[in-house]
Amino acid sequence: VDGQEPPPRDWYELLMAESTAAAIDPRIVDWSASVEVRHATHRLVTSEGGDVEQRYRIMLPGLAVSAHADGDTQTRTLNGYRGICQQGGPEVLARFGFAGAGRRVAEEALELVLAPNCPAGRMDVLLAPDQMVLQIHESIGHPLELDRILGDERNFAGTSFVTPDMFGHYRYGSELLNVTFDPTRPEELASYGYDDEGTRAERTWLIRRGILEHLWEDFFRLTDANRVGVLCNFLGIEGGVRPSHEHRYT
């Protein structure tokens, strides 16, 4: 990460300005503006002489406005709930138009609470980015976690319908479905230069033309070295990542 951190006063002034701008109508009953900044330093030292230090600065701005009318309450957010979480500095907020968004989100909240309910029935649906992200997260992200595939998460967060023999031929979706995991993109939340085993980051195809090819994450534990090692060799997997050193690899 590069650049200097803005002083707290600048953050407070920005948040107060957006909060004030959201109060446009008596039907606006709740609003919030926030910026969470996380700093982390990871250092990996190996017995083979490796020494890698990586520094991260993660920005999580949030803006939400709730409107109430005729017994109904609806909430509108900027880019979805937790929809903005990237590495970087104040440029992340500028990229998503945070400054000046308070009034717009409030207007959208009013439009939402006054809009008629969606009609019932079977029809085509166009997914907005925040819903598309959730769909990918649940339908592809979690099922391709190796700890779930191996059954280690069954008592915590569940298992997966994916089994090791599916890789290389299982049709996950239509030929239009292409999904990659690319930790080399500098701005993304899950980006890194080297993973927690010292493997250099690289772009990996998860699903290509609808066919399942690879896990989105890599996983290694000494307690499971034999069975995980066999699967990793089968899939051509190297490396491992985890959310923090309070957790096992995921």
Task: Describe each PLM feature range.
Residues 18, 155-250:
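Dual-mode signal for accessory low-complexity, basic/Gly-rich regions
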Residues 37, 65-69, 127-129, 140, ...:
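Short, structured patches in soluble enzyme cores that scaffold and shape functional sites
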Residues 66-68, 129, 145, 174, ...:
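Conduit-forming functional cores of very large proteins
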Residues 9, 123-141, 149, 154-156:
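Gly/Pro-rich turn-and-neighbor structural signature
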Residues 1-55, 87-130, 245-247:
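Acidic low-complexity segments
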Residues 54, 73-77, 134-137, 144-148, ...:
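Short helix/loop capping segments that flank catalytic or ligand/cofactor-binding pockets
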Residues 52-84, 205-208:
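Short beta-strand elements
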Residues 60, 77-92, 142-151, 220-233:
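Extended active-site and interfacial segments that coordinate phosphate-rich ligands
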